[in-house]
């Protein structure tokens, strides 16, 4: 349901919603004479069930420059009557030269910024949590650049209470996914990396429903730093 079909780069993208797994897309080629769409790649915006806390029902439009702007409906982590819910921030989809869909925040989100905090270059020792005391709040925009080097995994806990009763975990696993050549012949001898979002400890409220971890593939080029935004 909620189908949208738009050109993206030199190809086409078909966005839709599954009532079991949430928002998804097909990337492919469109024959205007035959009026046929030939998909070559399937991707997801949601990697588990859309309930609770998943994204669904996309609304999309062209940005007029070869990209696509999409906004999703989203269920909260609480039971709510009827069709009540929230919407995500807009996302801009673009197609890179390797036929990979790039996703980035879009719109005037800069107007939401208030108290800027900057953290200088910091060494991250293995198997130790580094707590940044001066970063607080329940609504944060994070722009972080991390040199993964040989680390197989890095974890960032956000929205963390002082005693760690509540926290949301973001984990990045370098080169721990499947071979990239399976989905793109141009990317030989490389593997997908993986990023997970875990909200099992995000709230201690009794009426908040926990969600299974999201686990999504991410392409990180050799020697490229990880940029989280």
Segments from the language model and where they lie:
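Beta-propeller blade termini and top-face loops
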Residues: 26-28
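Beta-rich accessory regions
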Residues: 21, 31-45, 49-53, 59-229
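Hydrophobic core segments of beta-strands in well-ordered, beta-rich domains
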Residues: 1-6, 10-18, 67-76
């Amino acid at each position: 349901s909620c189908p949208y079909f738009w050109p993206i780069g030199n190809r086409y993208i078909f966005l839709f919603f599954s009532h079991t797994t949430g928002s998804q897309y097909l990337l492919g080629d469109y024959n205007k004479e035959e009026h046929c769409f030939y998909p070559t790649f399937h991707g997801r915006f949601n990697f588990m069930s859309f309930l609770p806390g998943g994204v669904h029902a996309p609304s999309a439009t062209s940005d007029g420059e070869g990209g696509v702007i999409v906004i999703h409906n989203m269920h909260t982590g609480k039971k709510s009557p009827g069709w009540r819910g929230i919407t995500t921030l807009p996302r801009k989809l673009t197609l890179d030269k390797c036929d990979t869909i790039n996703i980035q925040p879009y719109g005037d989100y800069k107007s939401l910024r208030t108290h800027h905090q900057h953290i200088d270059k910091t060494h991250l020792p293995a198997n130790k949590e580094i707590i940044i005391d001066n970063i607080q709040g329940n609504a944060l925009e994070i722009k972080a650049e991390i040199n993964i080097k040989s680390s197989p995994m890095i974890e960032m806990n956000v929205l963390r209470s002082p005693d760690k009763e509540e926290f949301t975990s973001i984990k990045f696993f370098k080169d721990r996914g499947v071979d990239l050549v399976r989905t793109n012949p141009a990317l030989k001898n490389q593997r997908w990396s993986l990023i997970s979002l875990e909200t099992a400890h995000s709230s201690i409220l009794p009426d908040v429903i926990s969600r299974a971890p999201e686990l999504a593939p991410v392409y990180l080029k050799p020697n490229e730093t990880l940029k989280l935004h």
